[in-house]
């Protein structure tokens, strides 16, 4: 037993040497009040289910303004031909209106056109499996409580993926908690109020439960972070099949590289 405790303490000491170099821009899929410092950039690659990859680049234009682009590819890993989500990249834009103080949260407004999963194109029906946030506003508040603890709540409206007729304003919330200087645990809930139709053209059955996601982030070095995330823990979506319905709970790996220019 003593050997096990000693081994755990040794691992903890080994993994507390590096910490995240900037406030998190996102939890798993929803934004926070964090922006990139001026003159920095991140290159991020998301490895998704079904062999999909989602690379993205974000730039710190000023300390309060971050701009990014992303481009999704399905079935990139595996055999056969891969499929592009779209022929052009999606856009992310964040502007911090108010800095966080001891008494007030930070306030960020933004735009994110990147949805989750595959982009589905049918006659009169064009959207991602999970809609993009669109325009949003998010409030973030952090507390130094045995390591940083951050709470985030926001509202969003998708102005682009509305062919299903569901144009409701949506809500999301989440938190991130430092375990030590290297590891952070994250969880989020997207109410999906604008994405709760029971059946979209027989492609996806939605149960109206929203999307519950969680993840673990490791700051491996000052420039590199790795994440393991679990999506749709609430099993909101099912994918009809000839014999069975498959739920959409899935795992993904995210690789984030941070640098100055």
Predicted feature residues:
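Transmembrane beta-barrel domains of Gram-negative outer membranes and organellar outer membranes
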Residues: 17-149, 155-160, 176-261
């Amino acid at each position: 037993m003593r050997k096990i405790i000693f081994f755990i303490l040794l691992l903890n000491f080994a993994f507390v040497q590096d910490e995240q170099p900037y406030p998190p821009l996102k939890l798993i899929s929803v934004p926070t009040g964090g922006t990139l410092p001026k003159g920095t950039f991140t290159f991020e690659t998301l490895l998704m289910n079904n062999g999909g990859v989602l690379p993205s680049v974000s730039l710190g234009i000023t300390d309060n303004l971050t701009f990014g682009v992303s481009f999704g590819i399905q079935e990139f890993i595996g055999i056969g031909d891969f499929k592009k989500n779209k022929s052009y990249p999606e856009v992310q834009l964040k502007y911090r209106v108010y800095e966080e103080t001891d008494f007030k949260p930070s306030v960020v407004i933004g735009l994110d056109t990147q949805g989750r999963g595959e982009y589905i194109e049918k006659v009169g029906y064009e959207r991602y499996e999970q809609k993009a946030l669109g325009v949003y506003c998010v409030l973030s508040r952090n507390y130094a409580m045995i390591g940083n603890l951050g709470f985030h709540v926001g509202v969003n409206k998708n102005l682009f993926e509305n062919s299903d007729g569901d144009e409701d304003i949506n809500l999301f919330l989440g938190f991130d908690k430092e375990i030590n200087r290297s590891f952070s645990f994250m969880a989020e809930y997207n109410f999906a109020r604008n994405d709760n139709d029971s059946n979209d053209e027989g492609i996806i059955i939605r149960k109206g439960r929203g999307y519950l996601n969680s993840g673990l982030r490791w700051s491996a070095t000052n420039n590199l972070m790795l994440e393991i995330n679990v999506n749709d823990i609430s099993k909101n979506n099912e994918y009809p099949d000839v014999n069975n319905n498959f739920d959409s709970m899935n795992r993904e790996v995210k690789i984030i590289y941070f640098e100055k220019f």
